[in-house]
């Protein structure tokens, strides 16, 4: 994942950390001079479904965090999670936290609602729309 800036070269598909469905690499190069490095990489892929920045006040400690819907955890298909990524003021990753792993659901969508809460859409047969609220 990158934060895009005008005039920068992000390299797709000349460079990539990605793997095709058949197991081959998308590119033989993960990096080349003159091409911007990604800010965040998932190895192995979590099969990113959606990304949302949290800007509301309902979860003060989460303000400015990135929330990523993942459709897999590690190499196990059908075991997604919601990933919270804490960023510094320069958009650099400080740490990650896996949330909702106990659901064993692929996370299809995550969005901040107008009420400042997070809404998560899961997949699978028992798919649901979840509202994430503060504990207190």
Task: Provide a role label for each language-model segment.
Residues 1-97, 105, 127, 134-135:
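Beta-propeller domain segments
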Residues 109-136:
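Blade-level signature of beta-propeller repeat domains, shared across WD40, Kelch, NHL, RCC1
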């Amino acid at each position: 994942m990158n934060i895009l800036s005008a005039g920068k070269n992000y390299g797709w598909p000349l460079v990539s950390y990605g793997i095709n469905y058949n197991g081959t690499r998308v590119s033989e190069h993960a990096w080349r001079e003159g091409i911007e490095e990604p800010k965040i990489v998932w190895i192995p892929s979590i099969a990113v479904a959606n990304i949302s920045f949290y800007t509301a006040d309902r979860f003060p400690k989460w303000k400015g965090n990135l929330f990523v819907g993942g459709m897999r955890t590690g190499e196990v298909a059908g075991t997604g999670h919601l990933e919270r990524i804490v960023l510094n003021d320069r958009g650099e990753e400080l740490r990650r936290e896996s949330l909702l792993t106990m659901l064993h659901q692929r996370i299809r969508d995550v969005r901040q609602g107008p009420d400042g809460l997070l809404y998560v859409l899961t997949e699978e047969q028992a798919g649901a729309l979840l509202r994430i609220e503060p504990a207190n």
